[in-house]
């Protein structure tokens, strides 16, 4: 979104990106101010991601509005209310519960603000002395980008573990994914809420919008 002087009237102008992560026209600096590259009359104000036809969204799951000026920090979160689920197979890392819903999405207009995300889960494995864990994926359902993360190496005993990501992602729509990892031995059981009100696993974080 850009603003320009239209015969004395401040006027907004939008420019659709090429894709989720690539601008159709780059930004540039003019006297320390971000502008549309090649047109110093257009001052950059922010970006938004279209969640549907002629609509966008600002919710706990999707922070799709980004202001370059006067940004505030807002939280995002996703939980899985499934009591529990199992994970076996040759794919060592996947999105939690194999569900595309287990992620949060943000719009990052300029790569200069910190994003933080934490996954907290409880799990167990039916085998003996195998390692299972969790992570945070940034635009990936198979690569863990968390800088701090834990695992458990035990059998038939539930363990709690977390993963934490803190970084400045690239500009564009950013998918922040709740990941889980299997040891490919035995059967992993991950828990959502275990059918109680005393447990809830999920992903939480915050970003500037």
Language model features with spans:
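Beta-strand-rich solenoidal segments
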Residues: 1-92, 175
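Residues within well-ordered beta-strands of beta-sheet-rich folds
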Residues: 2-4, 114-118, 175-179
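A short linear-motif detector with a strong N-terminal bias
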Residues: 25-27, 94-97, 154-156, 177
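Terminal beta-strand-rich extracellular "head" domains
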Residues: 118-171, 178-209
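Substrate-binding/charge-relay-adjacent region of secreted/lumenal peptidase catalytic domains
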Residues: 79-88, 94-99, 136-140, 147
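Short beta-strands within extracellular/lumenal beta-sheet-rich domains
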Residues: 93-108, 158-163
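Extended extracellular/luminal ectodomain segments enriched in beta-structured repeat modules
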Residues: 108-116, 171
């Amino acid at each position: 979104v850009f603003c320009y002087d239209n015969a004395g009237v401040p006027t907004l102008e939008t420019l659709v990106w090429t894709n989720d992560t690539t601008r159709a026209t780059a930004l540039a600096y003019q006297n320390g101010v971000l502008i549309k590259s090649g047109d110093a009359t257009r001052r950059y104000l922010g970006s938004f991601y279209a969640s549907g036809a002629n609509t966008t969204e600002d919710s706990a799951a999707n922070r799709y509005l980004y202001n370059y000026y006067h940004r505030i920090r807002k939280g995002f979160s996703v939980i899985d209310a499934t009591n529990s689920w199992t994970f076996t197979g040759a794919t060592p890392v996947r999105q939690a519960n194999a569900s595309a819903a287990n992620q949060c999405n943000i719009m990052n207009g300029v790569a200069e603000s910190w994003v933080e995300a934490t996954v907290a889960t409880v799990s167990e494995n039916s085998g003996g002395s195998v390692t299972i864990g969790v992570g945070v994926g940034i635009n990936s359902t198979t690569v863990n980008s968390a800088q701090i993360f834990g695992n458990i190496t035990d059998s038939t005993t539930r363990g709690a573990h977390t993963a934490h990501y803190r970084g400045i992602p690239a500009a564009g729509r950013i998918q922040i994914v709740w990941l889980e990892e299997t040891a490919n031995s035995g059967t992993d059981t991950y828990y959502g809420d275990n059918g109680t009100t005393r447990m809830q696993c999920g992903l939480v974080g915050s970003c500037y919008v």
